[in-house]
């Protein structure tokens, strides 16, 4: 088997036309990921695919301790917070090297100027660095753009963030890959050469691996960064083999074509767990699958129609079929694993008769047509979106609602939804930082309902925003939970979604994979992973 896996690594290297492995004994780990990321630029990343793809290349000021959502130092060795909660001052690690590539060789180590650059280029307003970027959906939605007032260099090793208001989630936000620290020198070099797009397509970071090659829909190849500040990774080469279907990922895992397979189909969990060559990795996840209803499109701008859609869908049957033994119904816009999920809340019950009555009351007669978008491949929050879409269409058809099922390659799927171009859409979210605000504000706030935002239902309620906004500014958990419960009640009243399921995260691994720790956030970190015999 060892010979087979080494041969695979060499074969992939040949296919991708990258540099040859430096020895026959080089350690190559192949990760069967779920699809091609929409970008390799951290600040443009929206999906978990993109965040996983940029994670090997970049570091953040702070990070999450393995297997948890606890914030620990990374590029920053420490920080202080002012008594009013508005000023965060970070002390930066010394002698952190940036990677080199065929088009760039850094002349200095990371310093405060790089931190300021990494955030200022995303803030609203003029500035030379703005030409290097595009749409920063994560930053410019309800996240940091509305929170950060300024980022200031105090000296080479100190940076101060000044916030417009206190924010309980600020440190956790900084741990997300979208807030990675990038090279000012590299950005300006590409700008001067007239190739600013390379800053995004050929990324340079301080992370444990450097990008070697990206073949869309085939594979992404990384090589160990010898000068990483934590020390050289144990792996020589890391390959993301793009494998959209769960069945194909399982086949590759069993045959030894990959060492780790993402998002195992729940139906295959038992087979993996009983195979002596494999290991099933499972963890409760901060995951949420839902059906978003575009509240700006007629007749779905009528709350009675949205409630009817909720009541016409047999959620229990669908979730049992799609997540056998690995998913549970959710009643709110929060995963079950979230401490702020209101355990007293209940979603609309399945009641086709009442759904029909509501539609008639709203003046909707038979013959209503609408589009239903679904992701092109499996996700941990929805293992079989196409099947779910068909089951939803089957539930709505007796009410005279005819759905046209649509999909798109993953790199354009989310951008399509964020444009507001869908009527109904199956979507999902994996928590990026463990804070309830990650779901309640990111997916449902008025700020995120703007064009290009992550509130694809385009629902906006000032009362909801006020509750969630207040909860985001305080740190006392009991008070926050009460505010979030009241916001969840408003969500239920307006019915902009059909909440579907919260899933356990399931990955498969070869038995010789060492030090691989799953995250409740669904991310994959190979910086400490090794391969045994």
Question: Residue spans of the language-model regions?
Answer:
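Detector for C-terminal structural segments
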Residues: 28-33, 215-218, 224, 312-341, ...
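Structural transition elements
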Residues: 294, 328-362, 379-387
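Aromatic- and charge-enriched surface segment that lines or borders ligand/interaction sites
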Residues: 78-128, 160, 252, 299-301
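Surface-exposed binding/hinge segments that line
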Residues: 91, 114, 123-187
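A bilobed periplasmic-binding-protein/Venus flytrap-type ligand-binding module shared by bacterial periplasmic
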Residues: 223-226, 285-308, 312, 503
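A structural "hinge/loop" feature
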Residues: 35-52, 75, 102-106, 168-180, ...
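N-terminal lobe/hinge region of extracytoplasmic solute-binding protein
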Residues: 32-84, 120, 127, 202-208
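Ligand-site clamp/hinge motif
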Residues: 194-200, 225-271, 389, 402
């Amino acid at each position: 088997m060892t010979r087979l896996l080494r041969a695979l690594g060499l074969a992939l290297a040949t296919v991708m036309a990258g540099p040859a492995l430096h020895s026959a004994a080089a350690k190559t780990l192949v990760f069967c990921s779920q699809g091609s990321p929409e970008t390799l630029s951290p600040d443009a990343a929206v999906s978990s695919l993109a965040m996983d793809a940029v994670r090997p290349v970049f570091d953040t000021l702070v990070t999450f301790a393995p297997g948890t959502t606890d914030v620990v130092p990374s590029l920053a060795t420490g920080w202080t917070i002012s008594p009013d909660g508005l000023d965060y001052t970070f002390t930066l690690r010394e002698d952190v090297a940036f990677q080199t590539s065929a088009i760039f060789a850094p002349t200095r180590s990371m310093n405060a100027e790089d931190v300021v650059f990494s955030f200022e280029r995303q803030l609203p307003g003029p500035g030379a660095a703005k030409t290097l970027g595009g749409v920063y959906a994560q930053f410019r939605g309800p996240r940091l753009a509305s929170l950060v007032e300024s980022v200031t260099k105090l000296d080479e090793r100190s940076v101060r963030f000044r916030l417009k208001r206190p924010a309980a989630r600020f440190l956790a936000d900084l741990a997300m890959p979208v807030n990675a620290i990038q090279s000012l020198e590299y950005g300006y070099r590409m700008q001067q050469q007239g190739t600013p797009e390379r800053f995004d397509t050929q990324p340079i970071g301080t992370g444990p691996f450097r990008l070697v090659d990206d073949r869309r829909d085939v594979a992404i190849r990384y090589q160990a960064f010898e000068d990483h500040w934590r020390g050289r990774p144990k792996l020589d080469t890391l390959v993301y083999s793009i494998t959209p279907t769960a069945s194909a990922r399982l086949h590759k895992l069993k045959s030894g074509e990959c060492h780790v397979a993402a998002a195992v189909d729940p139906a295959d969990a038992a087979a993996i767990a009983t195979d002596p060559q494999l290991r099933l990795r499972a963890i409760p996840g901060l995951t949420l699958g839902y059906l978003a209803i575009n509240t700006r499109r007629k007749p779905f701008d009528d709350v009675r129609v949205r409630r009817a859609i909720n009541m016409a869908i047999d959620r229990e049957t669908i979730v049992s079929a799609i997540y056998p033994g690995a998913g549970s119904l959710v009643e709110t816009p929060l995963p079950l694993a979230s401490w702020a999920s209101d355990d007293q809340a209940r979603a609309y019950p399945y009641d086709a008769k009442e759904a029909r009555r509501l539609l008639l009351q709203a003046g909707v007669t038979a013959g209503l047509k609408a589009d239903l978008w679904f992701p092109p491949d499996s996700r941990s929050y929805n293992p079989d979106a196409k099947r779910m879409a068909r089951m939803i269409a089957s539930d709505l058809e007796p009410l005279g609602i005819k759905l046209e099922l649509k999909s798109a390659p993953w790199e354009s799927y989310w951008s399509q939804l964020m444009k507001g171009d869908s009527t109904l859409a199956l979507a999902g979210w994996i928590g990026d930082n463990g804070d309830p605000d990650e779901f309640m504000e990111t997916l449902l706030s008025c700020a995120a309902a703007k064009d290009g935002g992550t509130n694809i239902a385009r629902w906006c309620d000032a009362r909801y925003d006020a509750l969630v906004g207040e909860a985001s500014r305080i740190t006392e958990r009991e008070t926050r939970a009460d505010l979030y419960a009241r916001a969840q009640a408003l969500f239920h009243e307006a019915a902009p979604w059909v909440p579907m399921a919260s899933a356990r995260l399931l990955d498969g691994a070869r038995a010789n994979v060492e030090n691989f720790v799953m995250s409740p956030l669904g991310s994959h970190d190979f910086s400490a992973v090794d391969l045994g015999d």
